[in-house]
Amino acid sequence: MALWMRLLPLLALLALWAPAPTRAFVNQHLCGSHLVEALYLVCGERGFFYTPKARREVEDLQVRDVELAGAPGEGGLQPLALEGALQKRGIVEQCCTSICSLYQLENYCN
């Protein structure tokens, strides 16, 4: 019997045991639980840095924006004019609003 006939069952068995091809990580939008899962995948046992804003902090920012706007006709500073200067670029802005890479995710690992 030919050699290839004897190797055919072995090759078929190896083909069945081979891991399925996985899609490589491409730059993509990651939000919510998908972002957290990606951080767990990238950071592994090191863990990652995450400090969510408390509800009070968010409310304080909203009040500050209203105070900056002033009453109609007063010519107060518009919050949109200061938004770029006051806003930090966090992981949500990098990965959910914009497209994120593995290297950017690694910046948030411990």
Swiss-Prot record:
Keywords recorded for this protein, A-Z: Carbohydrate metabolism, Cleavage on pair of basic residues, Disulfide bond, Glucose metabolism, Hormone, Secreted, Signal
Propeptide: 57-87
Cysteines engaged in disulfide bonds, as pairs: 31-96, 43-109, 95-100
Localization of this protein: Secreted
Signal peptide coordinates: 1-24
UniProt record similarity statement: Belongs to the insulin family.
Name listed for the protein in its UniProt record: Insulin
Originating species: Canis lupus familiaris (Dog)
Lineage of origin: Eukaryota, Metazoa, Chordata, Craniata, Vertebrata
